[in-house]
Amino acid sequence: MALYIIFLLIASSFILFSFIFSQKPKGKLPPGPPKLPIIGNIHQTVGGLPHYVFRDLAKKYGPIMHLQLGQVSIMVVSSPRLAEEVLKTNDIVVANRPYSLVGDIVLYGSSDVAFGSYGDYWRQMKKIMTVEVLSAKKVAAISGTRQQEVNNLMEYIRSTCGKPFHVREHVMQRNNNIICKSLFGDNCKQQHVLIESLDEMMKLSTGFNVSDLFPNWGFLPVISGYKSTLTRIHKNIDSILSEIFEERKIKRQKGGASDEDMLDVLLNIKERGGLEFPVADNNIKAIFVNMFVGGTDTSVATIEWAMTELMRNPKVMSKAQAEVRQLFKGKNTILDKDLQDLVYLKYIIKETLRLHPVVPILLPRECRGPCKIGGYDIPMNTVLFVNAFACSTDPEYWDDAESFKPERFENSSLDLNGRACEYLPFGAGRRMCPGITFGMSVVEIILAQLLYYFNWELPNGLSPNDIDLTPNFGAVADKKVPLQIVPTLNSLK
């Protein structure tokens, strides 16, 4: 008991000392809500979905606002005009990521592309991912793997026609298979365990972890068990990946190198050498964790949200099915190359990503130096958040912004590449997601086949208005209530 009291006294003194002597940012800062001692504005950001909370606060305090979350000073941008100042005008200045214990422990010292600090090493690895791993050519090269898993999904649905189909569960299973086979071929014996560990990591990455909000208090992740949990997750992931790597190296020694999958591609790059920063196994592992995290939940959530909106909007569903069925009339198999002319389906996907962005708040950026945004002074080391959801539903830029209208993309130059900041499904600038082509290849082929081969109804007499549209609280904003729909087989005549 005495030791406990002593600990409390020491901790209280440390907290008070930190509060009294903490430096306040200088200059003309953006407005924001009043702060409490020590916790700042933390109490105003809990209790709701962050992209909704930030949007509602922005209505009161403006399109750029200052929040103090514990010891971390953040700015939240909620308008396309100011998002452009962040992601384009000041892109190089705000190209860093803030420190994350998850990145440090699980992602091999943040040596990955998603969470790594901006610099020469990061630029090299981003180029490798963009050119060697995730280019359109490489994505096309694994179309056979993608097609096989999608065919398996369609066969499963055929075998269960008339029964409720759990969209997320079954699409997730096939999508995970696509990613594993794309990375490792068929060599992923512990795929289920690997996915479970990655899911646990994602859950721990959700929201604002107290350890990241009070980085000066190094004891927090220790006494809370957060650090030990992350270490356990890292060991699980590393053990599985190390086994895969060792088996592949033995195979390569016997039969030579190839370009069959992404592991071979990256091992070839490692063995060729000649890079400014030699690529180690751990660097490749970090990229693979990025691929899993960025390619699993996001694609599946997009498919589920798209099917949700199609079920809620029967006229849109009918128009989409008519397009697919007219284009593929009589075909028993649909290939990637057949998707080029599905114009209306692409509008549906764009509108889904506008109204239901799977990453509604872009990954945070950190200022490498001071800059100005919206006429305000943004100090060095400030963390910046862009509320992509607020931008893509801003009524100044979008007519009837809360409604699902794929036709709004007719004669529109907006694309998925972040050229206009009112539409940022994958971010923009240097930190834009490099996996757009890979992810969209899965989304398009699955949606096209779901619409071509099957008709869909809601179970148990539900009406379209009964569908719950509440997003989940998580790193990916999928549906809180998973979508279940009933398929019946469409005649291909």
Curated annotation (Swiss-Prot):
Residue positions the entry lists as glycosylated: 209, 411
Cellular localization per UniProt: Membrane
UniProt keyword Cell membrane, yes or no: no
InterPro entries linked to this entry: Cyt_P450, Cyt_P450_CS, Cyt_P450_E_grp-I, Cyt_P450_sf
Protein residues bound to heme: 433
Superkingdom, taxonomy of origin: Eukaryota
PROSITE patterns in the cross-refs: CYTOCHROME_P450
Transmembrane segments: 1-21
GO molecular function: heme binding; iron ion binding; monooxygenase activity; oxidoreductase activity, acting on paired donors, with incorporation or reduction of molecular oxygen
GO CC annotations, alphabetized: membrane
GO biological process: sesquiterpene biosynthetic process; terpenoid biosynthetic process
Topological relation to the membrane, as annotated: Single-pass type II membrane protein
Cofactor(s) demanded: heme
Annotated function: Probably involved in the biosynthesis of germacrene-derived sesquiterpene lactones.
Family membership: Belongs to the cytochrome P450 family.
Record protein name field: Cytochrome P450 Tp9025
Organism: Tanacetum parthenium (Feverfew)
Phylogenetic classification of the source organism: Eukaryota, Viridiplantae, Streptophyta, Embryophyta, Tracheophyta
